[in-house]
């Protein structure tokens, strides 16, 4: 399926136009009826608004999938910003790299083919912004690992997708960002990607 999405984008989207690429991914999803676990257009607006507000220079992403959020993030932040995107699936990395290259954003995005658990301790600088959208049961342990690896600093933003629809998997994560005293955290209601009648939410947590 990921290859079919890429083929559709290459055939229909405008090269070096991130908005056109994202719109065509959305269009493929709606027309095909297949569910793609992108952040999607509705929660994407919340993500863009948060990025514009905080203007991060170093961004970490957990979960690349097909490069949708990498394109959205890289096209929203400034030219001197850089994104590091971690995903354990080689096919996801390959598709994402091609998507990002077609969007003209390869100079701002670095893909790491690894589990977050193995990659995080090897990162050697703090991040201004972390976008979490990978295996839901890994949100909490990987955030703890990020903290232990000293990859966050005061004012760092942690933006977690799907905390509404997967609430049962998010209890430890949400309890930590809301009650540990490390963050000021806000829950923003939205809808599941490409399912406007299904509730979802994002959690935006700022390290204090």
Report each predicted region and the residues it spans.
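A short acidic, Gly/Pro-enriched loop at the edge of an enzyme's catalytic core
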Residues: 121-130
């Amino acid at each position: 399926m990921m290859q079919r999405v890429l083929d559709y984008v290459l055939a229909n989207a405008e090269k070096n136009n991130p908005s056109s690429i994202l719109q065509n991914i959305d269009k493929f999803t709606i027309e095909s009826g297949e569910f793609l676990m992108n952040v999607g257009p509705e929660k994407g607006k919340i993500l863009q608004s948060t990025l514009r507000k905080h203007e991060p220079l170093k961004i970490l992403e957990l979960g690349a999938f097909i490069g949708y959020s990498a394109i959205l993030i890289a096209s929203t932040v400034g030219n001197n910003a850089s994104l590091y995107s971690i995903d354990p699936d080689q096919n996801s990395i390959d598709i994402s790299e091609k998507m990002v290259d077609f969007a003209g954003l390869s100079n701002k995005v670095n893909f790491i083919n690894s589990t977050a658990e193995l990659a995080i301790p090897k990162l050697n600088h703090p991040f201004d912004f972390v976008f979490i959208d990978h295996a839901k049961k890994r949100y909490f342990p990987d955030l703890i690992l990020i903290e232990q690896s000293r990859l966050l600093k005061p004012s760092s933003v942690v933006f977690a997708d799907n905390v509404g629809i997967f609430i049962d998997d998010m209890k430890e994560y949400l309890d930590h960002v809301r009650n540990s005293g490390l963050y000021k955290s806000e829950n923003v209601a939205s809808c599941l990607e490409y399912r406007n009648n299904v509730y979802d939410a994002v959690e935006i947590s700022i390290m204090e």
